[in-house]
Regions:
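Membrane-embedded alpha-helical bundles of multi-pass transporters/translocases
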Residues: 1-209, 214
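Positively charged, low-complexity/disordered segments
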Residues: 210-226
């Protein structure tokens, strides 16, 4: 039976995706269209391209992770390095400033590159991490409970990111009654989110121990369906 401490440490691995999802949903498009001045159509296209890349890299990462043979385990090497592209992409997404005098094409390329990089970094961690949740125990109810914990922590992380943004970084000031229009608040907001991403990866990673092969997992799930 999985201990509560293990469930908590494993679930912390959902923090990066919770932060990323909240930011991409509520903040990213606003930043580029209202602060930096990228045309909304181009910003939307950049997000669409990143989603298309994600649709390819997610199943590809699953296949690669399943077939990996390493002294660290099948899942662990990718989770270990994931924080690098994840955090760099996330921070650089919010690095442009109004005085950089970038063209629409330059901004579009910048947004596309670092949105894709952030998603690739997230894929490197999230796909192996989710797969591990299906391997750590043979008990169906335990796996279900573990993944429930994971989703709950990810939801809390996303909600906390929103409160942190609106409550602190984008709080109203005399100069900017609508705090989100303050251009100086965005980069510190991104750096703070990236720090939480970076910290959550090793916390979750160090408590993971893979136990079963991919074949074991597939056959077990098929039997449970019957």
């Amino acid at each position: 039976m999985l201990s509560t401490s293990f469930k908590i440490n494993y679930s912390i691995g959902s923090v990066p995706n919770g932060i990323k999802t909240d930011t991409f949903t509520f903040f990213l498009l606003f930043f580029y269209s209202n602060i930096i001045g990228l045309k909304p159509a181009l910003a939307g296209l950049a997000i669409f391209i990143a989603l298309c890349v994600d649709a390819v890299t997610d199943p590809l990462m699953g296949t690669i992770s399943d077939r990996t043979k390493s002294s660290l385990g099948r899942r662990h090497p990718y989770m270990l390095i994931s924080f690098i592209p994840m955090s760099l992409g996330y921070v650089f997404l919010f690095a442009p400033r109004q005085d950089w005098d970038m063209s629409q094409n330059d901004l579009f390329v910048w947004m596309t590159i670092f949105t894709v990089l952030t998603r690739i970094g997230m894929t490197l961690f999230d796909i192996p991490h989710r797969a591990f949740g299906g391997e750590v125990t043979k008990n169906y109810k335990e796996r279900t409970l573990l993944m429930s914990w994971r989703e709950m922590v990810g939801w809390v992380a996303g909600l906390s990111n929103a409160f942190l943004g609106y409550g602190i970084f984008f709080a109203s000031t005399p100069e900017y009654p609508q705090g989100q229009l303050n251009p100086d608040a965005w980069f510190p907001f991104a750096v703070t989110g990236a720090i939480f991403m970076i910290l959550s990866v090793p916390v979750s990673y160090t408590h993971l121990r893979a136990h079963e092969t991919r074949e074991d997992l597939v056959w077990r799930l098929l039997l449970e369906k019957k």
